[in-house]
A protein has these predicted regions:
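Generic beta-strand/beta-sheet core signal
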Residues: 77, 239, 247, 263-265, ...
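Solvent-exposed alpha-helices and their adjacent loops that cap or buttress functional pockets
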Residues: 55-57, 70-74, 89, 123-125, ...
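ADP-ribose/adenylate-binding Rossmann-like module
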Residues: 316-345
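Glycine-rich phosphate/diphosphate-binding loop of Rossmann-like nucleotide-binding domains
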Residues: 199, 204-312
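Fold-independent oxyanion-binding glycine-rich loops
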Residues: 136, 167-168, 182-183, 198, ...
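Short glycine/threonine-rich loop-to-helix capping motif typified by GTGT followed
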Residues: 136, 174-176, 243-252, 332-333
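Structural beta-strand/beta-sheet cores of well-ordered domains, especially the beta-sheet scaffolds
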Residues: 59-65, 78, 234, 255-258, ...
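N-terminal ligand-binding/catalytic initiation module
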Residues: 1-206
Length: 345
């Protein structure tokens, strides 16, 4: 509960000015609860309207994205870029391509990105973007045409010293490559810092693909060691099977854990012998298939419909790596009931 009068007043204004945006309002309330410990020590913040500026994006860009599918029919999606805060550096945050993407979710993610980036101690601001385009089931040519159309509008708002988007759900090296190629053609120069997550052969960074998944495991390993534990011999459940989840599973396995379950939006797989990462990577990276294929190809593995049911699998450590807000109260209760002693997100 927020009891600070200044924060209460700002929150009321945010709720009035941003109706119908539950994800964004949730993020603001959560951050304000933490800020209650700090705000009373800095009365100058209220005089300067600092929190009011903190919760209002500097710029919101919304645009249509027309593209042609393989049947020659024009499709239209909506694109977003929320440039939230550039106080300490260029806007930085990923692009998400998923049917659930809307303005509230993009603002929610962009708002949290300000704080995430500031914690790195690097001079990066916060932003987020994306589209309600669904790359699943689309051909490479369709994804390419969409990405080219998307960046043809967004290019005028980004740059290596202005805004440097990256990947997120639905946006990997393939999509970043399509967008960067179109960006380079439009601006007629090689601008290596404008889109991060590129392939190594055209300006990408070593281990960028693995960074987020590895990062959660390195962080978790430090926490475990602080409590006299480690990944060694622990049974782990990881939700998701995208970029973050895949490399979290890889690093977790290297650190001695046994990943027994992973999921996608339709259901989850359970392999009591531990997920075979070679098979998983082949299915998800090369074939871009559903995770259910794993159960068809690996003896002893099972596929269960319903991705939320993954938290019913017995484990020592649970790692939500699919999307935001994915572990609700029921999921948390299930994780505890099934023996987990740690949750890392």
């Amino acid at each position: 509960m927020i009891t600070n009068e200044y924060l209460q007043r700002v929150l009321a204004d945010v709720q009035k000015n941003h109706p119908g945006e539950p994800e964004f309002l949730q993020a603001v309330e959560e951050i304000f609860e933490s800020l209650q410990l700090v705000v009373p020590k800095h009365p100058e913040w209220e005089a300067a309207g600092l929190i009011e500026r903190f919760v209002e994006p500097e710029r919101i860009i919304m645009f249509r994205v027309p593209w042609v599918d393989d049947n020659g029919k024009v499709q239209v999606n909506r694109g977003y870029r929320v440039q939230f805060n550039s106080a300490i550096g260029p806007y930085k945050g990923g692009l998400r391509f998923h049917p659930s993407v809307n303005l509230s979710i993009v603002k929610f993610l962009g708002f949290e990105q300000i704080l995430k980036n500031s914690l790195t101690t690097l001079p990066m601001g916060g932003g987020k973007g994306g589209s309600d385009f669904d790359p699943k089931g689309k051909s490479d040519a369709e994804v390419m045409r969409f990405c080219q159309s998307f960046i043809t509008e967004l290019y005028r708002h980004i740059g290596q010293f202005t805004d440097t988007p990256a990947g997120d759900i639905g946006v990997g090296a393939r999509e970043i490559g399509f967008m960067y190629g179109q960006y380079k053609k439009i601006v007629d120069r090689f601008e290596g810092g404008v889109l991060t997550g590129k392939g190594l052969t055209y300006g990408g960074s070593l281990a960028r693909t693995q960074a987020t998944g590895y990062g959660i495991c390195y962080f978790s390993d430090e926490v475990l060691h602080y409590h006299g534990k480690s990944f060694e011999g622990q049974t782990v459940v990881i939700s998701g099977s995208g970029n973050v989840a895949q490399y979290a599973a890889e690093k977790c396995t290297e650190l001695g854990g046994k990943v027994v379950a992973m999921s996608d939006s339709k259901g989850y797989i359970y392999d009591p012998n531990g997920i075979n990462l070679d098979v998983l990577f082949d299915i998800k990276q090369k074939r871009r298939a559903r995770i259910s294929v794993y159960a068809d190809e690996v003896a002893g593995a099972q596929y269960v419909e319903g991705c939320k049911n993954i938290w019913n699998v017995k484990c020592d450590i649970a790692m939500p790596c699919a999307s935001q807000n994915e572990m609700d109260a029921e999921g948390a209760k299930a994780v505890i009931a099934n023996g987990a002693f740690a949750v890392f997100e």
